[in-house]
């Protein structure tokens, strides 16, 4: 999927191992991140949807951009109208095997 960034550049989005590495760091793993992004309430009755959404945006933009980006830079490059498209892209393209694992258990 291709999106246009606020700086005028076009970015082709792909699910890569780098993207999976970024989302792996989220407390609860990718499943919790996707739940939080969808607005599910936590044990205290609060949602973390904006935080989770920005974490996903950072992961996908930073992993597909050619230059290193900070969290803030990556999130600010995304147009508001592209947020739901990006979230849908991630949800549809992360392999089911990864979603079934609560945490990614890498073997050395």
Positions of PLM-derived features:
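A generic short alpha-helical patch detector that favors 3-5-residue windows
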Residues: 48-49
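Charged interaction scaffolds used for protein-protein
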Residues: 1-10, 20, 25-45, 63-108
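Short, hydrophobic/amphipathic alpha-helical patches that form generic packing surfaces
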Residues: 52-63
């Amino acid at each position: 999927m291709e999106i246009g960034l606020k700086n005028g550049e076009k970015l082709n989005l792909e699910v890569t191992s780098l993207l999976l590495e970024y989302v792996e760091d989220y407390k609860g793993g990718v499943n919790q991140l996707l739940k939080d992004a969808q607005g599910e309430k936590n044990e205290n009755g609060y949602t973390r949807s904006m935080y989770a959404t920005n974490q996903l945006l950072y992961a996908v933009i930073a992993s597909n951009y050619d230059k290193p980006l900070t969290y803030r830079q990556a999130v600010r490059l995304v147009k508001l109208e592209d947020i739901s498209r990006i979230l849908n892209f991630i949800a549809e393209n992360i392999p089911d095997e990864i979603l079934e694992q609560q945490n990614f258990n890498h073997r050395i």
